[in-house]
């Protein structure tokens, strides 16, 4: 299955993006991470995508490491950093989707 993870960071700093990207790849090295761009969701923030081939079971394991309280099912879920514990404090928003 194809997994896509949309990430919004509450920073527009290149070093912060690189730090979070490194942490994300430590959680799941098979992610292919896109370059970042200015976020349309949040001021002074950046967004990027990470994609991978992943099983539903492995996706659940990875999601549990990225955030402690997802809204939705494993194949379509979101999390916000203001009311949950993210894998990095700079992560403002995550959206994960699985496709057959």
Which residues are covered by each model-predicted region?
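Short, extreme N-terminal segment that most often corresponds to the first beta-strand
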Residues: 1-25
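Short, flexible, solvent-exposed loop/turn segments with mixed acidic/basic and small polar residues
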Residues: 1-3, 36-41
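Charged interaction segments
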Residues: 21-32, 43-100
